[in-house]
Amino acid sequence: MKGFVSECSLTYAGAMPPRAAPLSPDDRREALIRATRPLLYEHGTRVTTKLIAEAAGVAEGTIFRVFDSKDDLVDTTIARCFEPGDVLVRLDEIDPELPLRDRMLAMTSILQQRFLAIFELMRAIGAVGPPRHLHDRPEIVHGLEEVRRRLLALIEPDADRLTMPPEQVLHVWRLLTFAGSHREIADNDLLTPTQIVDTVLHGVEKTPERSAR
């Protein structure tokens, strides 16, 4: 019997995968933020450290080695959600050689997805707007300015075709994209990127050319 136990022990010990190398504190924080983010959409700020630990594949105590409290982790994750994230990368992937309408359709799709995600998060955490303390965070302020700069760069090449300056076109476009992506403002009838772009570029008045389409 002893030999059997010993043999089994060796067999299972040999089958066990090697233990993963421990993460640095910064990497552990990032892993916990990634695990917490989808949980906020599902549970809001009521999410528990048990759920977070399970999602991250760690013990609950691990959370408190890199965050002061659950609230600290939740607040950090919410702040991360308001950073531009991959929006900048996706805007940079838009081909500047595309026609103006196609460029604007692409940027509208990207920003609408961003707005929808932010609005869904605010509903989940019971907020009516971004937390006030986020307005002055350098990474968010700088990130939003970079988003604006990239959006403007996608419109400016066709400035001579527009009836108003590109900055004003961008302003009108952002207002319509924001409102048309907000379920309450839009009465649950969200505008599509095509509706938004065609309204900004062509208005709603019929013309012989458009009527013939």
PLM features: residue spans?
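Basic, helix-initiating cap at the start of DNA-binding domains
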Residues: M1-A55, D71-D72
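Amphipathic alpha-helical segments that line or abut small-molecule/effector binding pockets
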Residues: R34, R101-E120, T194-H202
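Short amphipathic alpha-helical elements of helix-turn-helix/winged-helix folds
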Residues: A35-L39, T76, I110, L176
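Alpha-helical DNA-contacting segments of helix-turn-helix folds
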Residues: L40, V74-C81, I118
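Short hydrophobic/aromatic patch on the recognition helix
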Residues: G57-F67
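Amphipathic alpha-helical linker/stalk segments
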Residues: A79-M107, L116
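Amphipathic alpha-helical packing segments from all-alpha helical-bundle domains
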Residues: R114-E120, A124, R132-D160, E167-H171, ...
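Conserved NTP phosphate-binding and transfer environment spanning the P-loop NTPase/kinase superfamily
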Residues: P157, L175-A186, P193-E209
